[in-house]
Amino acid sequence: MEQWESRGHLLTEQINPNSLNLDQLNPLELVDLFNREDAQTLKAIAMARQELALGISLTSQALAKGGRLFYIGAGTSGRLGVLDAAECPPTFCTPPELVQGIIAGGAAALVRSSEDLEDKAEDGAAIIAQREIHELDVVVGITAGGTTPYVHGALQAAKQRGATTIAISCVPAEQVEIAVDVDIRLLTGPELLAGSTRLKAGTVTKMALNILSTGTMVMLGKVYGNQMVDVAVTNHKLHDRALRIICHLTDVSREEAAILLEKSGRRVKLALLMQKTGLSAAAGQELLQKHRGQLRAALQAYNQID
């Protein structure tokens, strides 16, 4: 991609005038400078609020129809996608295939830098074919500088297969055009350490992924109030959290919550429905399935019948 050989014009590659004396600062001055610059991330998210909201809407609609969400990137961008995807099963009890993170170079690139692999657009296209991306899926390409061939190859291939495509980058559209359904631009300006996009660009990207995945799960009914009622109860900490969620939302004792949790097969959402309706685990599960796992909708339907 010869048009991208010179990258000095990109916002993420430019020199930050606020950090020209970076190597002369003492530790406290360094911390204060980073703190001031990181404030740009909040502004960038605010400026991209419409695109982020559209991304949530399209992604939740696709997943509700049986689609999957894929993050794809290289280097820091790829690692952030893998991280966000990995957090979905324990937080929302989703199957691991529902939200997947793909990084150029595979698992080895998570712990060892493999920057050269990002230059192969054909590899990005190949991974889309390998994962059998289809029209119900959503593919989020993450590239801070907007030019990563691996990501562009993946997005183009995904689009050809009819998938919904979303791009997350930290450069303005006039610098790099990305042909996608939702174009999220997170403009945090030049990095304190010139070109080191693991800094502000990485931070704001993680913020955007937090919003996109959590917002999608909220729309899918994985949350009740502000509680993670689909939490996977897989260790002592999460068992304690599950009990506290049940206690908070029902006012039962911790001992009663523990009994409910076991009767529900350690499914918090089902335990809540059982307590609030008096239904058996089987009947409660049937009602939840009828309402696509939406606890609030299931409760409203039960109360109308009752």
Swiss-Prot record:
Q: Which reaction does it catalyse?
A: N-acetyl-D-muramate 6-phosphate + H2O = N-acetyl-D-glucosamine 6-phosphate + (R)-lactate
The record's EC number reads 4.2.1.126
For this UniProt record, the keywords arranged alphabetically read as follows: Carbohydrate metabolism, Lyase
Tell me which residues this entry annotates as catalytic.
Answer: 87, 118
Q: Name one GO biological process term.
A: amino sugar catabolic process
Q: How does it assemble?
A: Homodimer.
* Descriptive protein name: N-acetylmuramic acid 6-phosphate etherase
Species the sequence originates in:
Microcystis aeruginosa (strain NIES-843 / IAM M-2473)
